[in-house]
Amino acid sequence: MSIENTDVHPEGYDDYVTFLKRRIRQLELQVRTLEADKERLERELSRLRMEMSRLRQPPAFAGNVIEVLDDERAIVQNYNGPRFVVRIAPWIERDKLKPGARVALDQRTMAIVELLPSEKDPSVLGFEVIERPKVTYNDIGGLEKQLQELREAIELPLKHPELFEQVGIEPPKGVLLYGPPGCGKTLMAKAVANHVNATFIRVVGSELVRKFIGEGARLVHELFELAKEKAPTIIFIDEIDAIGAKRMDETTGGEREVNRTLMQLLAEMDGFDPRGNVKVIAATNRPDILDPALLRPGRFDRLIEVPLPDYQGRLEILKVHTRKMNLKGVDLRVIAEITEGASGADLKAIATEAGMFAIRDRRTYVTQDDFLKAVDKVIGSEKRLAQQIAMHEVMYG
């Protein structure tokens, strides 16, 4: 870089010195700027050289860690291939190298050179996962007997496994809740998860049905892997009849894929410790169509019926859903009496509708008349719909 020549000199010696000093400062600033650019470009060049070096490396094998022998050696398996005792590269973080971890293996030496992220289907990550549900036993009315049985099967093994060891029995691996829709099966499962400080994973059976061969089975496997990672965990499979129906000898391609998914579920349940930190609860309103293999001991070996609530149950449910409502002159016993055949979900809808009637009339309290109109709207509309369906079937078959 050269200093610009100028034909016009400042008048006087002092002015010329000042001019030169200013020019020197400008050039020094330019030098510092160029040096900074040089350092930046050298760093970029170094990064690109490293990137080129990595790109020239031969591809690595992907595998799984079977067992970590010591700080320098581990047993690995290259997917469905033979097992090898291999070296562990010194830069690998030992605390993250655990059985089941996915790793990259050097093509020539089979040494572990990189830890890979866990492989999970996006569908698994899309399941409803609640670290700790907010539902408590006080939020459930009319199911004291069923809650007691569920707590014995799920809560006791997680909180007091030593009791089963002392008695010498194995706790149930899974619990099947069966009964009409809207009777509190999901709420019961969430309440148990809350009281044992467990992660709650809810999946609907139909979400495990996949189009392509093996996808459903892989999804089930990854569901249980996710549960083990977040243990203690309660897996709640709603509408399990979607994958757990009785198997037939003659099946179509789609039915065979559903059967593969069921077989994977059975294998997963057979493969974990009943005294471990993963419990399975399933729900269905069609227990009659379930495959007998699901219900044998060691799988869903505790069956709990969750029926429609009786009068006392309906009264307890109404108390739960109205405890935060501003009631005036409401006799819940009358409402419980006239709602025979209603489910817990129906009773919750009745309480909500009664509140809506009060809001519609610009009131801050709910009356008995609001509840009577709500009963007619919720229960009456269901009966009218059932009558219309029955009439349609009679007329059109």
Curated annotation (Swiss-Prot):
Residues 395-397 are annotated as: Docks into pockets in the proteasome alpha-ring to cause gate opening. Keywords: ATP-binding, Chaperone, Coiled coil, Cytoplasm, Nucleotide-binding, Proteasome. NCBIfam families: PRK03992.1 (NF003069), proteasome-activating nucleotidase (TIGR01242). Belongs to the AAA ATPase family. ATPase which is responsible for recognizing, binding, unfolding and translocation of substrate proteins into the archaeal 20S proteasome core particle. Is essential for opening the gate of the 20S proteasome via an interaction with its C-terminus, thereby allowing substrate entry and access to the site of proteolysis. Thus, the C-termini of the proteasomal ATPase function like a 'key in a lock' to induce gate opening and therefore regulate proteolysis. It is found in: Cytoplasm. GO terms for biological process: proteasome-mediated ubiquitin-dependent protein catabolic process; protein unfolding. Its main location: cytoplasm. Gene3D superfamilies: 1.10.8.60, Nucleic acid-binding proteins (2.40.50.140), P-loop containing nucleotide triphosphate hydrolases (3.40.50.300). Consists of three main regions, an N-terminal coiled-coil domain that may assist in substrate recognition, an interdomain involved in PAN hexamerization, and a C-terminal ATPase domain of the AAA type. This is Proteasome-activating nucleotidase. Homohexamer. The hexameric complex has a two-ring architecture resembling a top hat that caps the 20S proteasome core at one or both ends. Upon ATP-binding, the C-terminus of PAN interacts with the alpha-rings of the proteasome core by binding to the intersubunit pockets. GO terms for molecular function: ATP binding; ATP hydrolysis activity; proteasome-activating activity. Pfam families: AAA (PF00004), AAA_lid_3 (PF17862), Prot_ATP_ID_OB_C (PF16450). ATP binds at G182, C183, G184, K185, T186, L187, H321. CDD domains: RecA-like_PAN_like. One of its GO terms (cellular component) is proteasome regulatory particle, base subcomplex. Residues 15-58 form a coiled coil.
